[in-house]
Structures are given as structure tokens and as C-alpha cells.
Amino acid sequence: MVLRALPAAPVVAGEASVAAALRVVAGIFAAPAFLRHAAASVFFVGGFMALQSLWVVPWVMNVNGFDLAGAATVLVALNLGNLAGQLAVGFLGVRLARAGVEPVSLLRAGYGAMLVVQALILWSGLPVLLLWTLFGLLTAANSQIYLSAARAFPPALFGRVSTALNLMAFAGAFAVQWGFGIGLDFMRDMGVELTRALAFGFGGLLLLQLFAYLPLLGHVSARARVGGA
């Protein structure tokens, strides 16, 4: 009975669908609209994840002279700022869209402000807690990168575009965490004091973010055609 129920020829529909899906994914990664957002996902989204999860506490303890309790307070303020920013985006997002404000415009404004605030963290003597709270607030702009990139693709590909950006973000978080650590170890071995090494590392991330920001200032291209979508 089982043998009689088996098809005479192998079913290739599954293989074809997998191949088609892979072509679509490859098309997303190769699309200019995705590439202009990819570096920002790596160094803004991934960079924030790396700072939030690993490097904020060593920075404020060694550069700003905070104790562990003070560093924990800064970390809480950073996350509360991010929460407030996300709530603001959720509350105002629909209203701004109805007013004709595009996600890419919010992304440009948010990332531009993030660059300024991080430069102030690095070089100014302004209150530390205020700056990190403001930085957390502005990181809510990261959510706009998904909407901005997806606008250039068919609506059916929103999930795949978002997944591709998430992949870039997590790769960026790992690369920034790992690269920051390797750079610090190298500079410490060269005799650079820890505070200066941290400043060089943070400055390097800021420079990479600046380069990642520039493609977002370009012309928004028409909707891409990817694979069969």
C-alpha cells in the first residue's frame, strides 16, 4: 500500500520554491536600495547594540570616573531614553506619515542628531547622564531603517528585507564588540592608556557611522524588482 502511494517521479516543487526564495534573498542583498541602508544597519543599529550591551559601562567608569552604581544609573537612563523614543515614534509615527514625512527623513534627522550627541559624549564636558539619556532617545530612529529600506521593495518582501537588515545589525554588533576589544588590547600593548584607547575606539565607531550615514543622504530610488516578487 505504501509503495503504491508513492509518486512515480520525485516532486521538485519544493526544490524550485527554495531556489526561488534564495534568488529573492540574493536579489535583496544585491539591490542598491538595500546596500544604501546596510552599512547604517551595521554601525548604527549594531553599534548601539554593542555599546548598550558591553561598552557603555567601561566607558563611563574609566573615562568619566563613575563607580559601578553610577555606571548602572547611566545604563538605566540610556534604556529609559530608548523606551521613551520608541513610544514617541509609535505615537507620532502615523501622524507624521499622514503629514507626508517619509521614514528616510526621520532616519536622516535621527542619525544626524545621534552623530552630534555621540561627538558631545566623546569631546564635551556636558552632563554625562543627560547625554546618554538623549543618545538613548535618539536611537529610536533605528526602527525607521526597516521602513525606509522596505519602501524600495514590493510590500510582500517587507519581512525578508527586515530579516536581512537584522542580519546586518547583529553582524555589526558582534563586529563592533569584537573589534573594539581587539583595538583596545592592541593599543594597551602599545602603551596607550585605557582612557585614550577607549576614546580612539569610540571615535573610530563614530567615523564609521559617519561614512554609513552618507549613502542615506542620496536620492531615494524607485521601487526595486527582486526575483519574481
Kindly give the residue locations of the regions a language model identified.
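C-terminal membrane-cytosol helix-exit motif in multi-pass small-molecule transporters
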Residues: 1-13, 212-220
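Juxtamembrane intracellular "pre-TM" segments in multi-pass secondary transporters
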Residues: 7-38, 63
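Extracytoplasmic gate region of multi-pass secondary transporters
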Residues: 32-90, 150, 173-181
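A membrane-interface helix-boundary motif in multi-pass transporters
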Residues: 67, 182-208
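Helix-to-loop junctions at the C-terminal end of transmembrane segments
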Residues: 85-101, 184
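Structural signature of the two symmetry-related core transmembrane helices
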Residues: 103-119
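Intracellular juxtamembrane helix-capping segments at the cytosolic ends
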Residues: 141-154
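A late C-terminal transmembrane helix in Major Facilitator Superfamily
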Residues: 152-189
